[in-house]
């Protein structure tokens, strides 16, 4: 067990420091903004230091383990730990949240509550990625929903209450299945109930029971990921939320669903995953085509980007269903890659809206001349999203392709069919992304609204965009840096599978 409680500090610090925001002196919003950004920076530096100096990359086992008794009555423990699978998402969470607080600079209404909710969300997300106890995982999963609901319902567009209610109904409905799965896994098997992750991994279940558990967890994670047909909350939510909230939703929240699928469905329930993986493969393939086609018909800029996120999640689903080292590593790389690209696209869409006050693509046009910096960054991230070689999305999608082709679980004809349909999806992606760029930036200036201030991005916005663009290019040029984190853990997970 680790001597110094690094992970406990990393999980508790944001929400504890965030609660002190309400006691800060009333001297305008500047104090609150700087305080929040300093907390996020401190948290990111602490996380980076702990992982650089106390985490061995060549060790696939759980590290920095902390295990404390919490409730003696039913052996509920505060158990945290990090391995190669959760290391990337935790660092991504710290990075995106820090930039999202910087992006939220223009928020002035109830800014104390706004920044507290962002920090509370930060704690819940890091807790979800690092918990090693199933009930603790569930508590952190739920803790993170409340701030998101409040951020959606209080700051956003005209239909924000509708989209926030839809979000909470979907996610709370999914959480019921998650709780049933957690209690089922915890109560089954040994003489005394245990929610310890390591014990549950080594537990064998009857096939019928394992399938029931698998379906419960799958529904919970399918809402978050999202998987068709449980995706309809996402476009509404993204269309109405403030863009700093969108950065956290697209960058981190969706990735929690993918993380849960790998961590619980693949690692705890390998036999059921082997049975369900062909269905996941089919759904992932349909999702790529369906979301790309639907995105093309969206008038609302943020909804179009939201559907592109749904399409990209299809690649993660296919990578997870391929049950190969290459495919699963590609899915994990896509989790990190899309975390950066999705957050950046929503940030740039939001900053464009701040200037021209228009959300519908057919009302825009000719924005490239007055806003060349925003045009350059938006075009660059669009290229990253359509998997241009040299950027992170390309490596992830190629690895997922190779994962399907090399998979021994599937016959040749299904592999050819899935690869062909995925290729069609990859052709549709540039169509909707480039047409979106054309409608916003090219052509004649269509808007003549009196309240539109067309000036280019300032230093703060440029800093946020470039900070996200550097890792996108870095991972594209040298993907081994991210892959080396998870490659040993992926081998460990897949050692339980017959098909490799």
UniProtKB/Swiss-Prot annotation:
Membrane topology according to the record: Multi-pass membrane protein
UniProt key word Transcription regulation: no
Keywords, sorted A to Z: Chloroplast, Membrane, NAD, NADP, Plastid, Plastoquinone, Quinone, Thylakoid, Translocase, Transmembrane, Transmembrane helix
InterPro entries: NADH_Q_OxRdtase_chain4, NADH_Q_OxRdtase_chainM/4, NADH_UbQ_OxRdtase, ND/Mrp_TM
EC number(s) from the headed UniProt entry: 7.1.1.-
Top-level EC class: translocase
Main location as per UniProt: plastid
Protein name: NAD(P)H-quinone oxidoreductase chain 4, chloroplastic
Gene that this sequence comes from: ndhD
């Amino acid at each position: 067990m680790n001597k110094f409680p690094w992970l406990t500090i990393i999980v508790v610090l944001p929400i504890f420091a965030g609660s002190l925001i309400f006691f800060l002196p009333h001297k305008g919003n500047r104090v609150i903004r700087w305080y929040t950004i300093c907390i996020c920076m401190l948290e990111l530096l602490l996380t980076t230091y702990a992982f650089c100096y106390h985490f061995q990359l060549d060790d696939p086992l759980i590290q920095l383990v902390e295990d404390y008794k919490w409730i003696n009555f039913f052996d509920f423990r505060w158990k945290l730990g990090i391995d190669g699978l959760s290391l990337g998402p935790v660092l991504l969470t710290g990075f995106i949240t820090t930039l999202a607080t910087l992006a939220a600079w223009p928020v002035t209404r109830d800014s104390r509550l706004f920044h507290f909710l962002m920090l509370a969300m930060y704690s819940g997300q890091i807790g979800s990625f690092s918990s090693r106890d199933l009930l603790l995982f569930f508590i952190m999963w739920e803790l993170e929903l409340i701030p998101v609901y409040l951020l959606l319902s209080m700051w956003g567009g005209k239909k924000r209450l509708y989209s926030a209610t839809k979000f909470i109904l979907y996610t709370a409905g999914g959480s019921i299945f998650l709780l049933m799965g957690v209690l089922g896994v915890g109560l089954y098997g040994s003489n005394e109930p245990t929610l310890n992750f390591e014990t549950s991994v080594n537990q064998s279940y009857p096939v019928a029971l394992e399938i029931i558990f698998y379906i419960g967890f799958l529904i919970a994670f399918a809402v978050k990921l999202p998987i068709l047909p449980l995706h309809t909350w996402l476009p509404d939510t993204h269309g109405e939320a403030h863009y700093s909230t969108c950065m956290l939703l697209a960058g981190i929240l969706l990735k929690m669903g993918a993380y849960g699928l790998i961590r619980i469905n693949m690692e705890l329930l390998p036999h059921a995953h082997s049975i369900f993986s062909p269905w996941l493969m089919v759904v992932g393939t349909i999702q790529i085509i369906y979301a790309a086609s639907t995105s093309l018909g969206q008038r609302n800029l943020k909804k179009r980007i939201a559907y592109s996120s749904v399409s990209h999640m299809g690649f993660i689903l296919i990578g997870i269903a391929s049950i190969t080292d290459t495919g699963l590593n590609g899915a994990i790389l896509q989790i990190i890659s899309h975390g950066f690209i999705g957050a950046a696209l929503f940030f740039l869409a939001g900053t464009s809206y701040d200037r021209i006050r228009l959300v519908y693509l057919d009302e825009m046009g000719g924005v490239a001349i007055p806003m060349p910096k925003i045009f350059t960054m938006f075009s660059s991230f669009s290229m990253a999203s359509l998997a241009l070689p040299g950027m992170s999305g390309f490596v992830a999608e190629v690895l997922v392709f190779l994962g399907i082709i090399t998979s021994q679980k599937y016959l040749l004809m299904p592999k050819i069919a899935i690869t062909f349909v995925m290729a069609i999806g990859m052709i549709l992606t540039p169509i909707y992304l480039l047409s979106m760029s054309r409608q916003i930036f090219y052509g004649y200036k269509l808007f003549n609204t009196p309240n539109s201030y067309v000036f280019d991005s300032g230093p703060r916005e440029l800093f946020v965009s470039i900070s996200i663009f550097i890792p996108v290019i870095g991972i594209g040029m040298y993907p081994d840096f991210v892959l080396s984190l998870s490659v040993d853990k992926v081998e460990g997970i897949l050692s339980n599978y017959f098909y490799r």
